[in-house]
């Protein structure tokens, strides 16, 4: 609440690169972010970098079970990195949770396919956002899972995803813009 530009927290879960936080620690983190947001008149959100672990969104459901943090303050991102995670994310959104699709993830669920599939499954556009993970680290692993390098994610995939939504998925431009603009603004308050 004291640092002007800080509007919440971000933590990696369900990922081999996370610090493997326990459910109670995650619930406490999300609750502190929520309270800080209330005190500082900010969003007080908790963003979760989702990995490919079979745990999927279980850590977020544990937060909801072990705290009083509203679902509207939790944001799983990178949900299109695997089919099983994306299916779980659609369920999360159908229950009222906001989900974030990463434009820089080429598959297995492309960003434009992810938006289209979510909408076709009944997810409201206002519960979807698309982000680039721009300036985030992009680790490179070999076939054995060894880190071989680290790059930096760019922003160009945002425009590419918007174009694909309109030209490939045949979504009207006004609707295609929502996950990049209005839904993000609403989520961040």
Model-derived regions, located:
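Active-site core of metal-dependent hydrolases
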Residues: 15-21, 25-141, 147-148, 152
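His/Asp/Glu-enriched, well-ordered alpha-helical/loop segment
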Residues: 120-189
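Proteins with a high burden of low-complexity, intrinsically disordered sequence enriched in S/T/G/P/A and R
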Residues: 1-2, 28, 189
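Metal-cofactor-binding active-site regions of metalloenzymes
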Residues: 1-19
């Amino acid at each position: 609440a004291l640092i002007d530009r800080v509007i919440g927290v971000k933590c990696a879960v369900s990922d081999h690169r996370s610090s493997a936080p326990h459910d109670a620690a995650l619930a406490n983190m999300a609750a502190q972010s929520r309270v800080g947001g209330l005190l500082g008149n900010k969003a007080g959100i908790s963003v979760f970098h989702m990995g490919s672990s079979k745990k999927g969104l279980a850590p977020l459901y544990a937060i909801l079970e072990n705290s009083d943090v509203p679902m509207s303050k939790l944001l799983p991102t990178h949900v299109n990195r695997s089919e099983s995670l994306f299916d779980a994310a659609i369920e999360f959104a159908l229950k009222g949770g906001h989900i974030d699709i990463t434009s820089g993830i080429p598959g297995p669920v492309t960003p434009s396919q992810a938006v289209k599939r979510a909408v076709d499954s009944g997810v409201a556009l206002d519960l979807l956002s698309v982000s680039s993970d721009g300036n985030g680290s992009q680790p490179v692993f070999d076939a054995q899972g060894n880190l071989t390098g680290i790059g930096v994610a760019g922003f160009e995939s945002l425009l590419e995803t918007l174009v694909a939504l309109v030209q490939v998925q045949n979504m009207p431009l006004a609707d295609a813009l929502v996950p990049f603009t209005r839904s993000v603004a609403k989520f961040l308050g």
